[in-house]
From Swiss-Prot:
GO terms for biological process: lactate metabolic process; tricarboxylic acid cycle. NAD(+) binds at residues 10-15, 34, 96, 119-121. It comes from the Bacteria. InterPro entries: L-lactate/malate_DH (IPR001557), Lactate/malate_DH_C (IPR022383), Lactate/malate_DH_N (IPR001236), Lactate_DH/Glyco_Ohase_4_C (IPR015955), Malate_DH_type3 (IPR011275), NAD(P)-bd_dom_sf (IPR036291). It comes from Novosphingobium aromaticivorans (strain ATCC 700278 / DSM 12444 / CCUG 56034 / CIP 105152 / NBRC 16084 / F199). Gene3D superfamilies: Lactate dehydrogenase/glycoside hydrolase, family 4, C-terminal, NAD(P)-binding Rossmann-like Domain. Substrate binds at residues 83, 89, 121, 152. This is Malate dehydrogenase. PANTHER family: L-2-HYDROXYCARBOXYLATE DEHYDROGENASE (NAD(P)(+)) (PTHR43128), L-LACTATE DEHYDROGENASE (PTHR43128:SF16). Catalyzes the reversible oxidation of malate to oxaloacetate.
Length: 320
């Protein structure tokens, strides 16, 4: 049986980490693409030389030509720039929209049957634009946000309760930003909902509220510490979890930025919701019942995503 092919668009910190994880897990052969000559080739060569040490047989190549992604089963997109001090949201949107246009056209022309995972920020707008530019079906284009945000939420809760991270299960919905919605009613420690643990006296509502806020600003906290970059280990691990769910038809329920068409009262947007990922991509949007507070918070998040999309349409009229 032919090996699967994983194409990684963008060979920065996340792209390189994605390649390493995909090779370690033997997900398939790997193509690293970047517009900067030498970078994907150099990282591919370096990673290939990990093979004898780590015991993987994945073939890893680097390229500056979109033809190199032809026939990819999974494509993970990290290309674009990070927001820098003094850069407005519209500046970031303008730059990364152009990147998504080039990437979308490259995917459309070379790998139209791929399952595409977008990681580029601002995520909810970029995954929407990428689908528009690529013309792929909505179930085959998804954004990586909720898996990462939920991992951050789970980490902070495990620390607070002093329990194994394996026993913590959380959901973060909504947009990937300050308006995201960590849902405590569906967040559990070995099946026990967080609100019940608070009632038992194992934490306080004030501490849980602080953890919710820390989750919302989780990416910014890491940027503030690193000063010259942003998170890449956990984002890459999150993207790989989504790729595995598709490649291995795992039928996993994961929070992702997915296209919603009526679910949660939302139409025609990409927003963070629980979805079932299997061999057909996003096979189902899972509509869970939310309490009034979570519903209100989700609506605020949806409105923020709508604003981003309107800004995108203003920058590139072809999206209107």
């Amino acid at each position: 049986m032919a090996r699967k092919k994983i194409a990684l668009i963008g060979a920065g910190n996340i792209g390189g980490t994605l390649a390493h994880l995909a090779a370690q897990k033997e997900l398939g052969d790997i193509v690293l693409f970047d517009v900067v000559e030498g970078v994907p080739q150099g990282k591919a060569l370096d990673l290939s030389q990990c093979g004898p040490v780590e015991g993987f047989d994945a073939n890893i190549i680097g390229t500056n030509d979109y033809k190199g992604i032809a026939g990819a089963d999974v494509i993970i997109v990290t290309a674009g720039v990070a927001r820098k001090p003094g850069m407005s949201r519209d500046d970031l949107l303008g730059i990364n929209l152009k990147v998504m246009k080039a990437v979308g056209e490259g995917i459309r022309d070379n790998a139209p049957d791929a399952f595409v995972i977008c990681i580029t920020n601002p995520l909810d707008a970029m995954v929407w634009a990428l689908r528009e530019f690529s013309g792929l079906p909505a179930n085959k284009v998804v954004g990586m946000a909720g898996v990462l945000d939920s991992a951050r939420f789970s980490t902070f809760l495990a620390w607070e309760f002093g329990v194994s991270i394996r026993d913590v299960n959380t959901f973060v919905l909504g947009g990937h930003g300050d308006t995201m919605v960590p849902v405590t009613q569906y967040s559990t420690v070995n099946g026990i909902p967080v609100p019940d643990l608070v009632k038992m006296g194992l934490s306080t509502q004030e501490k849980i509220d602080a953890i919710v806020q820390r989750t919302r600003s989780g990416g910014g906290e890491i940027v503030g510490l690193l000063k010259t970059g942003s998170a890449f280990y956990a984002p890459a691990a999150s993207g790989i979890a989504m790729a595995e769910a598709y490649l291995n038809d795992q039928k996993r329920i994961l929070p992702c930025a997915a296209y919603v068409d009526g679910e949660y009262g939302v139409n025609g947007l990409y927003v963070g919701v629980p979805v079932l990922i299997g061999a057909n991509g996003v096979e189902k949007v899972i509509e869970i019942e939310l309490d009034d507070e979570a519903k209100g918070n989700l609506q605020v998040s949806v409105d923020a995503v709508k604003e981003l999309l309107e800004a995108c349409k203003g920058i590139d009229p072809s999206l209107a």
